[in-house]
Amino acid sequence: MKLLSFGYTDVGFVRESNEDSFLVSDEKGIYAVADGLGGLPHGSLASRMAVQFFDAMIANADVCHTESELENVVKGIHRFLIENGEKVAGEDGIGTTLTVLRSAGDKVLMGHVGDSAAFVLNGNGLQKLSKDHTLEQEILDKLKPGESIEEQDLPEYYHHTLTRCL
């Protein structure tokens, strides 16, 4: 399997500060993107800590080759953010989304919390690998076959209100 990777982040036109962090490490076969929660203080710190801790937990290419190992890594990052977030921000803590990929031989493992999406570009075009953890997606998941809902029928905040984060 051939992987091509690239990382770039930009504040865009809407926000004043960029709370995104990312990691591209072809040597280790690890990739991450995190977006600090804008509703909590220290979003950029949370995303940076999550990505740096992920990098530290995967010390080399011989570590983390199963879904359960990657799940344990993400849970470890969550615990780390809870413990250290309280030191920085008190009871409110800090929060971030996190999507990580681990290239393990002929497969790619994914860990995902929040709405930082992962995509693959292949012969079928660009395909989304992750599922957003938002109120909007929760409602869409509850629809029965044949049912649909128009995007404009949902309150605006449903599109970006997270149901899961670190």
What do these predicted ranges mean?
Residues 1-166:
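PP2C/PPM-type serine/threonine phosphatase catalytic domain
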